[in-house]
Amino acid sequence: MTRHGKNSTAASVYTYHERRRDAKASGYGTLHARLGADSIKEFHCCSLTLQPCRNPVISPTGYIFDREAILENILAQKKAYAKKLKEYEKQVAEESAAAKIAEGQAETFTKRTQFSAIESTPSRTGAVATPRPEVGSLKRQGGVMSTEIAAKVKAHGEEGVMSNMKGDKSTSLPSFWIPELNPTAVATKLEKPSSKVLCPVSGKPIKLKELLEVKFTPMPGTETAAHRKFLCPVTRDELTNTTRCAYLKKSKSVVKYDVVEKLIKGDGIDPINGEPMSEDDIIELQRGGTGYSATNETKAKLIRPQLELQ
């Protein structure tokens, strides 16, 4: 009875299971995956490494990074920009050189045409030039002119049509045997790269001086634990992935957002060091992940080329 498993793909219908299996192996089709809790970072972890930060910093959009990881990312972006800029400058130099060559060839062709016109001008007065055949006529040199054939061609369709194709393709004649007449792929032109450094998560421009140091308040007894816990320095409540938190620029601390709404917005003073604050001195932290679809986006999608079956 083990032979039934060997013939699982012998059906005449391309099943859904076979399509999914072939899509994973062939590199075609969009892939979907359900992310678990281990694939989603916590609120105090780095957004790049998904690991606890040794030297945490925060971006203007509220994402937490490890200083070492974000510096390596910024350096990699600058190296990629320098590489793309060299390729773009090389393309511009090649285009300018090709334009100069084409201009020189056009000038040479113009001079040759003018010289040929001067040489073909009759020097004797009364000389008669040989008449040239009309363009598009069906007159054979040295033969008999047939006006009936030309009338039939005009009656059947447009002049200059080389095939039964319509539109612009009707006047073109591609040939498999002649390389010059075969359609070729045109090389895509490179656009000038942008020198802006972007945040790897939000995609917005970011500067190194905009990254601010973060001081989390650890919960007593968890300083040396594998999974450290942190609390709000004002309310002394535990901060979790579902807690709405805010970063205070004056004291570099992370507090619950209830502190901002109930204390800071009314008094305009940092409750930790007593310095005056404004709304620009408050950054809302991006929340961490819980692994539940009701709270976070737990589905990942990878878009790849689609496999078309005839």
Curated annotation (Swiss-Prot):
Residues 115-141 are annotated as: Disordered. Disulfide bonds: none annotated. Keywords: Cytoplasm, Nucleus. CDD domains: RING-Ubox1_NOSIP, RING-Ubox2_NOSIP. One of its GO terms (cellular component) is cytoplasm. InterPro entries: NOSIP (IPR016818), Znf-NOSIP (IPR031790), Znf_RING/FYVE/PHD (IPR013083). One of its GO terms (molecular function) is ubiquitin protein ligase activity. It holds the Pfam family zf-NOSIP. The keyword Metal-binding does not apply. It is found in: Cytoplasm; Nucleus. Residues 115-124 have a biased composition (Polar residues). The keyword Hydrolase does not apply. Negatively regulates nitric oxide production by inducing nitric oxide synthase translocation to actin cytoskeleton and inhibiting its enzymatic activity. Belongs to the NOSIP family. This is Nitric oxide synthase-interacting protein homolog. It comes from Caenorhabditis elegans.
